[in-house]
């Protein structure tokens, strides 16, 4: 088992390998972008601390904004895309825009990964600089020979990411962003997930947390509104039922476990079998013979690294047998080696005919806060997801 996890982790951690296109290769420094702006003076001390961050306490200090730093503007998963007139004319802006607005996986209706606004470089006013996620296109044949992604934190506001993508010309820019489209979108997705984890750190549902401790000897932070907690055999369910603009919305997080057998545990067939059996026993539908089940043919399964360990992440759709009801779910399965079991944290929503991206992402962040029994004893434990690093390759 340990050899399997180690092998997968080594493969997946390679996502941080640097990539680029163009003439030559250079190593990037994520904090260099503010070097020619007045923001450098305001953020230099924070940047220095960030480079020394090696544990949870220092990471928290890195994210703490100065009393003089304004709060960032905009909602989660909103991005401001900035380009020059030539960047609009050559299609460089459109290329990146199309990547950022690609469909979010695991949702029945078409919803973009991000809500993106596009402006000309000259329109980047003091007000717009407060946006939480900013990407600036810099194409200059006289200044750049290599395509590169760089970013700085909390330049004009907090929390904030100000990223730049530089290139020699439009062709090199397009080639770079298309080759690294998944890494670029994942970079900003993880930034937003980590921001939500920071919110959960300060405010989470105590009853769900206590139920997970008693049932599994584990820990989890879920949104405080999930205040209806139901427990069963190796099963805990936190839920929230409410109306948003007169439309019914249900938010749910469940934690359940089953014995770990071998690496074949993490096949799609076995996942669906175990999930359906757990849901049938614990989440009945309205009437006899009705229960939650996994919608076949829509599962997107990926092998990930969560807290330095292997995790199976599944995004898909659920429905109720013989009943017109369904929605989206995301599950994160991890191995509790101490107790030789698989512990699954899953979020699912019911919000018919309305956008689900933001609520599903909010619940997804909570899934990554799950601490297994072995992790509770760690003196230092980081809840944050590892960042995606995009810099030139050899």
What are these regions (language model features)?
Residues 174-198, 341-394:
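Surface-exposed amphipathic alpha-helical segments
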Residues 160-169, 253-257, 341-350:
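Short, well-ordered beta-strand elements
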Residues 112-171, 279-339, 354, 390-393:
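Signature of long, low-cysteine stretches enriched in small and polar/charged residues
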Residues 58-75, 80-86, 223-283:
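Secretory pathway targeting signatures of secreted, lumenal, and periplasmic proteins
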Residues 217-234, 366-374:
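Short conserved aromatic/hydrophobic patches within beta-strands of well-structured domains
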Residues 32-159:
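Start-of-domain marker
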Residues 1-9:
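Bacterial N-terminal signal peptides that target proteins for export
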Residues 19-20:
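C-terminal motif of bacterial Sec signal peptides marking the signal peptidase cleavage site
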């Amino acid at each position: 088992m340990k050899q399997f996890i180690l092998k997968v982790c080594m493969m997946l951690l390679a996502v941080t390998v640097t990539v680029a296109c163009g003439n030559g290769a250079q190593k990037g420094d994520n904090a260099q972008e503010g070097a020619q702006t007045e923001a450098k003076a305001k953020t230099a001390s924070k940047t220095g601390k960030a480079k020394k961050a090696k544990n949870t306490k220092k990471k928290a200090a890195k994210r703490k904004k100065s009393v003089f730093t304004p709060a960032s503007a905009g909602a989660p998963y909103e991005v401001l895309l900035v380009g020059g007139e030539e960047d609009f004319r050559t299609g460089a802006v459109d290329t990146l825009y199309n990547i950022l607005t690609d469909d979010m996986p695991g949702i029945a209706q078409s919803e973009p990964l991000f809500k993106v606004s596009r402006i000309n470089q000259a329109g980047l006013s003091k007000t717009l600089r407060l946006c939480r996620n900013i990407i600036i296109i810099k194409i200059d044949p006289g200044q750049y020979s290599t395509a590169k992604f760089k970013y700085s934190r909390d330049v004009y506001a907090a929390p904030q990411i100000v990223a730049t993508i530089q290139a020699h010309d439009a062709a090199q820019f397009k080639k770079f962003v298309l080759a690294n489209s998944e890494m670029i979108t994942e970079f900003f997705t993880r930034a937003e997930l980590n921001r939500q984890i920071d919110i959960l750190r300060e405010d989470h549902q105590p009853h769900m947390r206590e139920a997970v401790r008693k049932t599994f000897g584990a820990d989890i932070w879920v949104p405080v509104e999930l205040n209806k907690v139901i427990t069963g055999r190796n099963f805990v369910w936190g839920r929230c039922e409410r109306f948003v603009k007169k439309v019914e919305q249900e938010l749910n997080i469940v934690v359940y476990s089953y014995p770990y057998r071998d690496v074949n545990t993490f096949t799609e067939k076995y996942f669906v079998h175990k999930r359906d059996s757990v849901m049938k026993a614990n989440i009945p539908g309205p009437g006899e013979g009705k229960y939650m089940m996994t919608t076949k043919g829509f599962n997107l399964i990926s092998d990930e690294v969560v807290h330095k360990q292997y995790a199976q992440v599944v995004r898909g759709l659920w429905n109720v047998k013989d009943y017109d009801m369904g929605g989206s779910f995301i599950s994160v399965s991890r191995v509790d080696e101490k107790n030789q079991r698989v512990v699954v944290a899953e979020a699912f929503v019911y919000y018919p005919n309305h956008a689900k991206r933001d609520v599903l992402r909010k619940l997804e962040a909570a899934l990554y806060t799950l601490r297994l029994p072995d992790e509770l004893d760690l003196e230092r434990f980081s809840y944050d997801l590892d960042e995606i690093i995009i810099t030139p390759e050899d």
